[in-house]
Amino acid sequence: MSCVYAFGSNGQRQLGLGHDEDMDTPQRSVPGDDGAIVRKIACGGNHSVMLTNDGNLVGCGDNRRGELDSAQALRQVHDWRPVEVPAPVVDVACGWDTTVIVDADGRVWQRGGGCYEFTQQHVPLNSNDERIAVYGCFQNFVVVQGTRVYGWGSNTKCQLQEPKSRSLKEPVLVYDTGSVAVDYVAMGKDFMVIVDEGGRIVHASGRLPTGFELKQQQKRHNLVVLCMWTSIHLWNARLNTVESFGRGTHSQLFPQERLDFPIVGVATGSEHGILTTANQEGKSHCYNVYCWGWGEHGNCGPQKGSQPGLQLVGQYSGKPRVFGGCATTWIVL
């Protein structure tokens, strides 16, 4: 498997380190010695899952609500172990205490939240070869196929549809662009932002962060949109900038300091961000990984709490991929 480093919140052993101590520097969680490649890491409130390129899923952390395993007596998965799935997996997302997968046959399954088995979510998808992807945050999930976005879960802020309601148990059509395919959905705790294949924001709903106005952003293109629970971040690779919207009570807004090297990757966790830059050193490149935001569990490095500015957490000769969880940070090499 790819070599995976993790740090941050670990009270339910969600970092896969074999202990339950929070860590403030990158720790090797997966040694990277069996050939499998990590495609994606998704995290809930206290559990983590990794999807590999062969369609397998492994997980660790909290199982008190059936997030990972069917054994109700198993309250905690101490180390990475396989998650039994109905079929090979092509995508995965996590809510606070739930796990949702899309299998190779285009079916959507959910477990957790008190359910200890995968049960099928009947999303009205077309039986064609269009990509199907799932995204989740806190108490919401959405599934994307072509021009359509379907969602279920909390609707207390009208993030799925109007009028507001406590929860939608069955998937509903959230949005249909009608023409251009949806690329992805960026989700916060009470809101979502839908982005098309041109990097344009086509829809936003729910309790949007302070300062974000949909009409002001819809004319822009080639954006990468990322969300924390309470903020929105727009990465413009051409301008080498990250623009943030929200209150920033714990330094979640991107620090407006000059970057001397190009940004090559950005990810967000619950209330922190992870940034990768490419640095030229002679004839070779090296890559720096920084964090910013709320680092209460060491997920932004040794300087815990709300630290202004970018915190350097690692330097690598190969380009890393980065993922953010609930006060956890992941680096994949």
From Swiss-Prot:
<dbReference type="InterPro" id="IPR009091">
    <property type="entry name" value="RCC1/BLIP-II"/>
</dbReference>
<dbReference type="GO" id="GO:0005737">
    <property type="term" value="C:cytoplasm"/>
</dbReference>
<protein>
    <recommendedName>
        <fullName>Protein KTI13</fullName>
    </recommendedName>
</protein>
<feature type="repeat" description="RCC1 3">
    <location>
        <begin position="146"/>
        <end position="197"/>
    </location>
</feature>
<dbReference type="GO" id="GO:0002098">
    <property type="term" value="P:tRNA wobble uridine modification"/>
</dbReference>
<keyword id="KW-0819">tRNA processing</keyword>
<comment type="function">
    <text>Together with KTI11; associates with the elongator complex and is required for tRNA Wobble base modifications mediated by the elongator complex. Association with the elongator complex is mediated via interaction with KTI11. The elongator complex is required for multiple tRNA modifications, including mcm5U (5-methoxycarbonylmethyl uridine), mcm5s 2U (5-methoxycarbonylmethyl-2-thiouridine), and ncm5U (5-carbamoylmethyl uridine). Together with KTI11; also required for diphthamide biosynthesis; diphthamide is a post-translational modification of histidine which occurs in elongation factor 2.</text>
</comment>
<comment type="subunit">
    <text>Interacts with KTI11/DPH3; the interaction is direct.</text>
</comment>
<dbReference type="GO" id="GO:0017183">
    <property type="term" value="P:protein histidyl modification to diphthamide"/>
</dbReference>
<dbReference type="GO" id="GO:0016567">
    <property type="term" value="P:protein ubiquitination"/>
</dbReference>
<dbReference type="GO" id="GO:0006511">
    <property type="term" value="P:ubiquitin-dependent protein catabolic process"/>
</dbReference>
<keyword id="KW-0677">Repeat</keyword>
<feature type="repeat" description="RCC1 4">
    <location>
        <begin position="286"/>
        <end position="333"/>
    </location>
</feature>
<feature type="repeat" description="RCC1 2">
    <location>
        <begin position="55"/>
        <end position="104"/>
    </location>
</feature>
<dbReference type="Pfam" id="PF13540">
    <property type="entry name" value="RCC1_2"/>
</dbReference>
<feature type="repeat" description="RCC1 1">
    <location>
        <begin position="1"/>
        <end position="53"/>
    </location>
</feature>
<dbReference type="InterPro" id="IPR051553">
    <property type="entry name" value="Ran_GTPase-activating"/>
</dbReference>
<dbReference type="GO" id="GO:0061630">
    <property type="term" value="F:ubiquitin protein ligase activity"/>
</dbReference>
<dbReference type="InterPro" id="IPR000408">
    <property type="entry name" value="Reg_chr_condens"/>
</dbReference>
<keyword id="KW-0963">Cytoplasm</keyword>
